[in-house]
């Protein structure tokens, strides 16, 4: 069910099959086999094999990384690395010679560095770097980091395994497989990526918390850890497993050198400055270049000497260290191995993906010595071999006079593995048993670049006198950390204790261990290196006591490398899933914002259309009203004119009657008066007629004007009412529009919050899923580790059990011979008595041997019980750490969800608070428009009253002609 949910989270509804993209620095149309010739295999990385290739035209060498890529998505995982390599042209950064994608395989051609990686050189020489060598490496790394950080690139996986060497004594910073290329200078990252031992504290915190991202200052911390690694072969806390080392980095103080007195004050101060847990106060690479530790570096001679020594001709021979008097052991003569020249470039040449290479390792493990029948117990367990010894140098003539040039004794910092002890002058140190203290053991670790002779003499005397104590098994590391651990979020190195060595006896009262004589089972490997530095031929001879533990150490490193590859694959898949999920979330947000914008635009468009329709309807209605008004005025004017014409005709008839009456009155007068009276009366009638006619026409004109004004006023009132009605409807529409937009905004806020909340849940679901997968892989690796420990213990116990009868027979013969000799010397008693005494002694020996066998059986049972308890404790501790991490992730998810809800509620409250003034401003604007409309209507009415010649006057409709006037 969880896996189905996980697939659902990563599935996009709009995903289609991706088309092939064209990348600037990747060629798709060319078969790399036509350009490059494979001349050898360098190794097998986590994602593909690495070959040594030669350009067919120029003859240039390259390291070719060939990766199977089945899809465009997988190809995109490596594009960042290719782009970074292609854009970084710097003398201390490895160069990209080409990239090809052909026939489902990605070929990345990288500059070939013959010197190999620094960690491989340290393994080859069995010592760390000297301070002058560290200074040069540090200086060149800082210059490379300054260049990278200036291009907004974070390396994120700095360590000795990713620092390659050239024959000229320069470094090449490599492995950009987990690097980040930012778009902005101040951009930060929150990916939990890199190798645990070199991780900065702020990067460690990103495993479960993404709230504290990191920037390029994380590389400065990794640089400081890398310098400690170069000084001590191993990084700090290498004895811890990755789960615990992450907690150690996050909670403990910054690491320091194990033996500060062996190093200069400038080096210690540089480490203190670089290893600042606060990234804000941690200096940049450019600032560190001004530090006295590196500012005085002017030459790379120290690195040229280092590369020459690592690539020197090596003569190896094995000297048998067993007792010559061992009757049951065959004497093996020391046989010199064939001369060979080591090519350290064939080891860890390419640090891409940080998986160091297996097939051409610069450190060829010597053949393990077979377990021999010894008198003092079985062979040593893994991790308890002997340390190399140093011998004086052979100096060849190298000056102009042909005289021998005195060369000082080269000091070594050998690797300490368990109970290996550093000695000098090719002498084996463990002559007699003794107790070794943890402090003494730590003092002999490979952290001292220049051990003095007095310390060696003191150690030799302690071994001889049996006063040196061994560490307890629970505190002893099983094997060296694999320096080729690669770029993974976790590592397979462990800190769980090993069982007791078979070459050590247990003091059950004190609980201490004592070394038994292991010379019967160990051999001495002597190496002689010859190389030339500045015309001086130097010969260095080193000796190291070896045993079968060497092979077991190699097996342990190989198994750890396999485990780290598994974790690296998990991390790569996790990064791909995170990228897909982030892309999905970005697409969802983008689609949601587009949909929001479309919805808002659609809503605005709807209301805009409604407003437009309303305004158009209003305009049409007003135009129709005006047309109706004009028609009405014409009809009303026509009707009134007709009525006035009829009235005027009647008025004329009345005037005619009045004229007749005047005539009738005149005719009634005497004849002599008629003419004069008629003339007078007719003049009076004519004047009266004119006056009445003028008054009548004026009255008609006034009535017409009043009628027209009344009609115009009615029309204006109707239009004003219609305008008010339309404005009201328009404002209601605006209110509805704003209310719909506000409701949509609130809905969008809610929807966006729900989407972001779901995306956050998906993000944490993916984190939990990946964390559980990682935990499952860690438990699987822990189970395999525990099973290996149990199997090794069983094999060791079987060897002890098989060896004990031989030892008892040898001891029995010796004791019997000594007893018989003592009886013969004493000469007491008869032959029968001597036979009886011998018989009794034989019976006592049988009882003693039986008791030894029972004691051994009990010891084995106790060892197995302790081992099972230790394995169970290991699993419990791992489970507890994993549970704490899961609980922390769930707790952080709860806090993030709570903070997200609180932020949403706050945003919603702020939005609602801002909504009130928006509503108020809208109402004020609408009221202002109403007032402006009323003011406009009022001003129009006043102008009508003040302007009698207004177009709306009656004269507009009825111009009077001369006929009308007549």
Swiss-Prot record:
Residues 571-945 form a coiled coil. Residues 437-451 have a biased composition (Low complexity). Residues 318-331 have a biased composition (Acidic residues). GO terms for cellular component: plasma membrane. It is found in: Cell membrane. Pfam families: Pkinase, PKK. Keywords: ATP-binding, Cell cycle, Cell membrane, Coiled coil, Kinase, Membrane, Nucleotide-binding, Phosphoprotein, Serine/threonine-protein kinase, Transferase. Residues 833-863 have a biased composition (Basic and acidic residues). Residues 452-467, 486-512 have a biased composition (Polar residues). The active site is at 157 (proton acceptor). GO terms for molecular function: ATP binding; protein homodimerization activity; protein serine kinase activity; protein serine/threonine kinase activity. Residues 175-224 are annotated as: Activation segment. It catalyses: L-seryl-[protein] + ATP = O-phospho-L-seryl-[protein] + ADP + H(+); L-threonyl-[protein] + ATP = O-phospho-L-threonyl-[protein] + ADP + H(+). The modification Phosphoserine is found at residues 13, 20, 191, 437, 449, 453, 483, 512, 547. One of its GO terms (biological process) is regulation of lymphocyte migration. Residues 36-294 form the Protein kinase domain. Inhibited by the pyrrole-indolinone inhibitor SU11274 (K00593): intercalates between the ATP-binding Lys-65 and alpha-C glutamate (Glu-81), resulting in a partial disordering of the lysine side chain. Also specifically inhibited by erlotinib. Slightly inhibited by gefitinib. Serine/threonine-protein kinase involved in regulation of lymphocyte migration. Phosphorylates MSN, and possibly PLK1. Involved in regulation of lymphocyte migration by mediating phosphorylation of ERM proteins such as MSN. Acts as a negative regulator of MAP3K1/MEKK1. May also act as a cell cycle regulator by acting as a polo kinase kinase: mediates phosphorylation of PLK1 in vitro; however such data require additional evidences in vivo. Homodimer; homodimerization is required for activation segment autophosphorylation. This is Serine/threonine-protein kinase 10. It comes from Bos taurus (Bovine).
């Amino acid at each position: 069910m969880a896996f189905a949910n996980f697939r659902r989270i990563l599935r996009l509804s709009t995903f289609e099959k991706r088309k092939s993209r064209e990348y600037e620095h990747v060629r798709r149309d060319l078969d790399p086999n036509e350009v490059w010739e494979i001349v050898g295999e360098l190794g097998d990385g986590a994602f593909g094999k690495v070959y040594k290739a030669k350009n067919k035209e120029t003859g240039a060498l390259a390291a070719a990384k060939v990766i199977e890529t089945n899809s465009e998505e997988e190809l995109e995982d490596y594009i960042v690395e290719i782009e970074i390599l292609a854009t970084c042209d710097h003398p201390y950064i490895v160069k990209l010679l080409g990239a090809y994608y052909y026939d489902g395989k990605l070929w990345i051609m990288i500059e070939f560095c013959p010197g190999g990686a620094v960690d491989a050189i340290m393994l080859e020489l069995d010592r760390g770097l000297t301070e002058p060598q560290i200074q040069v490496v540090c200086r060149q790394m800082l210059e490379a980091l300054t260049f990278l950080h200036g291009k907004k690139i974070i390396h994120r996986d700095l360590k000795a395994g990713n620092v390659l060497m050239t024959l000229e004594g320069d470094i090449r910073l490599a492995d950009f497989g987990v690097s980040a290329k930012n778009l902005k200078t101040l951009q930060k990252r929150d990916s939990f990526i890199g190798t645990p031992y070199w991780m900065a504290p702020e990067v460690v915190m990103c495993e479960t918390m993404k709230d504290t991202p990191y920037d390029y200052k994380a590389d400065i911390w990794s640089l400081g850890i890398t310098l400690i690694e170069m000084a001590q072969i191993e990084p700090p806390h290498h004895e811890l497993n990755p789960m615990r080392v992450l907690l150690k980095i996050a909670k403990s103080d910054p690491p320091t050198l194990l033996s500060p007195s062996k190093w200069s004050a400038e080096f210690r101060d540089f480490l203190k400055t670089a290893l600042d847990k606060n990234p804000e106060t941690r200096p940049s690479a450019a600032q560190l270049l001004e530090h006295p530790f590196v500012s005085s570096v002017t030459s790379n001679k120290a690195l040229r000497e280092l590369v020459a020594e690592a690539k020197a001709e090596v003569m190896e021979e094995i000297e048998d260290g067993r007792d010559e008097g061992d009757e049951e052991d065959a004497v093996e003569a020391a046989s010199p191995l064939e001369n060979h020249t080591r090519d350290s470039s064939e080891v860890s040449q390419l640090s891409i993906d940080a998986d160091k290479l297996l097939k051409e390792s610069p450190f060829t493990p010597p053949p393990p010595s077979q377990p021999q029948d010894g008198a003092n117990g079985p062979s040593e367990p893994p991790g308890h071999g002997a340390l190399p010894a140093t011998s004086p140098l052979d100096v060849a003539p190298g000056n102009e006079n042909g005289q021998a040039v005195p060369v000082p004794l080269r000091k070594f910092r050998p690797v300490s593995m368990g109970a290996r002890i550093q000695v000098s002058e090719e002498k084996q140190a463990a002559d007699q048993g003794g107790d070794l203290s943890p402090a003494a053991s730590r003092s002999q670790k490979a952290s001292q670049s220049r051990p003095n002779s007095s310390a060696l003499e003191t150690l030799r005397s302690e071994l001889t006198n049996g006063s040196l104590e061994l560490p307890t098994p629970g505190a002893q590391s099983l094997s060296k950390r694999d320096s080729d651990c690669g770029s993974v979020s976790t590592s397979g190195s462990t800190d769980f204790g090993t069982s007791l060595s078979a070459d050590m006896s247990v003091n059950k009262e004190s609980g201490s261990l004592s070394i038994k004589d292991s010379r019967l089972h160990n051999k001495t490997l002597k190496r002689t290196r010859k190389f030339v530095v500045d015309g001086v031929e130097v010969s260095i001879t080193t000796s190291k006591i070896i045993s079968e533990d060497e092979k077991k150490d190699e097996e342990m490193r190989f198994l750890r490398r396999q485990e780290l590859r598994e974790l690296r694959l998990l991390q790569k898949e996790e990064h791909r899933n995170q990228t897909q999920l982030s892309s999905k979330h970005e697409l969802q947000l983008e689609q949601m914002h587009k949909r929001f914008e479309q919805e808002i635009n659609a809503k605005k468009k709807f209301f805009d259309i409604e407003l437009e329709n309303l305004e158009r309807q209003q305009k049409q209605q007003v135009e129709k009203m005006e047309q109706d008004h004009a028609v009405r005025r014409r009809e009303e004017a026509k009707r009134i004119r007709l009525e006035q014409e009829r009235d005027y005709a009647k008025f004329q008839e009345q005037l005619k009657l009045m004229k007749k009456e005047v005539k009738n009155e005149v005719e009634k007068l005497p004849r002599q008066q008629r003419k004069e009276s008629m003339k007078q009366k007719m003049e009076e009638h004519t004047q009266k007629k004119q006056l009445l006619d003028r008054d009548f026409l004026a009255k008609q004109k006034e009535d017409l004007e009043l009628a027209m004004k009344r009609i115009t006023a009615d029309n204006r009132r109707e239009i004003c009412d219609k305008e008010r009605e339309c404005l009201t409807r328009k404002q209601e529409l605006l209110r509805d529009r704003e209310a719909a937009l506000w409701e949509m905004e609130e809905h969008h806020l809610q929807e966006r919050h729900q989407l972001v909340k779901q995306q956050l849940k998906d993000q944490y679901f993916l984190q939990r899923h990946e964390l559980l997968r990682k935990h499952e892989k860690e438990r699987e690796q822990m189970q395999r580790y525990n099973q290996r420990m149990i199997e090794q213990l069983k094999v060791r116990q079987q060897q002890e059990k098989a060896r004990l009868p031989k030892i008892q027979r040898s001891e029995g013969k010796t004791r019997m011979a000594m007893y018989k000799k003592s009886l013969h010397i004493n000469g007491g008693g008869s032959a029968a008595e001597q036979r009886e005494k011998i018989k009794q002694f034989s019976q006592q020996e049988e009882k003693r041997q039986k008791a030894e066998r029972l004691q051994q059986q009990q010891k084995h049972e106790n060892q197995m019980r302790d081992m099972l308890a230790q394995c169970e404790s290991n699993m419990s501790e791992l489970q507890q750490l994993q549970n704490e991490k899961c609980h922390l992730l769930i707790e952080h998810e709860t806090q993030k969800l709570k903070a997200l809800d609180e932020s949403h509620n706050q945003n919603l409250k702020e939005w609602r608070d801002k909504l009130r003034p928006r509503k108020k401003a809208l109402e004020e604007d609408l009221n202002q428009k109403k007032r402006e409309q009323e003011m406009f209507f009022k001003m129009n009415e006043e102008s009508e009253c003040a302007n009698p010649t207004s177009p709306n006057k009656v004269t507009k409709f009825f111009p009077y002609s001369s006929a009308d006037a007549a």
